[in-house]
Amino acid sequence: MFPIDIDFSRLKEVFTYDPQAPMIFSSGIFLWLFAAFMVVYVLLQHKYTARILFVTLFSYYFYYKSSGTYFFLLAIVTVCDFLLAQLMYRTEGYWKRKGLVTLSLGVNLGLLAYFKYTNFLGGVIASLMGGEFTALDIFLPVGISFFTFQSLSYTIDVYRKEIQPLTSLLDYAFYVSFFPQLVAGPIVRARDFIPQIRKPLFVSQEMFGRGIFLILSGLFKKAIISDYISINFVERIFENPTLYSGVENLMGVYGYALQIYCDFSGYSDMAIGIALLLGFHFNLNFNSPYKSASITEFWRRWHISLSSWLKDYLYISLGGNRKGKIRQYLNLIITMFLGGLWHGASWNFVLWGTFHGVALAMHKIWMTITGRRKGEQSYGWRRVFGIIITFHFVCFCWIFFRNADFQNSMDMLGQIFTTFRPQLFPQLLEGYWKVFALMLLGFLLHFAPDSWENAVCRGVIRLPFAGKAVLMVALIYLVIQMKISEIQPFIYFQF
């Protein structure tokens, strides 16, 4: 008999929650668990209820590995909104229906407010009253902003009579907790996802190939580009901007613009890719946002699931563009102000959102003055100029988004405008050539024509299974070779 050596410490790691190492798609433990998950998933392909139950339980396990026992919040939101939607559907009275949807808003936003905004609001109130506030020790569950908004979209749609409520609590739990998008989006609409739940499991060759391509693309953007430039350059600049020249600070800002894009879009790519392997379709969440020639276009390309959610459930509820131009501009600013607050309970996020809201309003005013129609594209040098201006405005806003301390942001801007010495760039390039090479690669890939990406995707789809496996192994090997520390958590986990 051969001795069996079991590493029980590693086995314990699989079943326990470690707040210092939440489970993420790019971690080794997830890749191994997902492989085992797929075996069971395929075996249950013709047993609809068993398959839905299995995925739901795995999703709760996945959330437990991200936030520990706070998975009970997910259950509270699920049960409350499922029951409230049922009551709304059976209720005819306007005010009764209004009361039920208000209760749903209260449950979801109440949980969000307590866990995310208690200390922020307490500090603001204490400051206004001239007192002091001692911050409470409140844990922020991962992804609470995402699953509360996702569940709210369901109850609001039922209230508006745009969809009928589900009759199965299990199906609704599956929708709210579906692990590929649970902790960092994209925010999936009920009307798009729920009809897919009970469909026969079918993964075409194209779906499988595209899923693999998106997983590889997301892993490359996250683990190769984002993590490397963050650890080796961006973090150093943002932590101590006064120690670096204006050129270094500007390159740090460009680096962060690429880092946050590769980090968040990389997660979205992996989420969409994993969903495709499971037979589900998600809508696009990023569409080359830095190619935008206006701030309005940027928000049609950046975090599309959130921007469309804010438009449909907040901006339109405030009146949208139905109550005159001034009210429309104010609604844009309010929507983006609250959108900034959604990202975090801190003034830097509020400022970031307000900047974008004012810019959106100013762009609307400019469109009115010039007589340009909604959605009308600019071409040639005008579009190039628009892309440059929009990109640098977005970068300016990223400075305040990244820096929790306002003075740090002002120091960084001061360095850029007062100590900008381009003659230092060759020396900087010599010291950080790997970082700048990855930044150049990242921006080239971002600005490449969509047809190039589609061609590569088609190539992956046509590869035999063995070829896809070789690609996956090669990328994982590259990640291991370039890793100089533990893989960094996704930036949007904190939201």
What function would you assign to each model-found segment?
Residues F2-Q494:
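Membrane-embedded transmembrane alpha-helical bundles that form the catalytic cores
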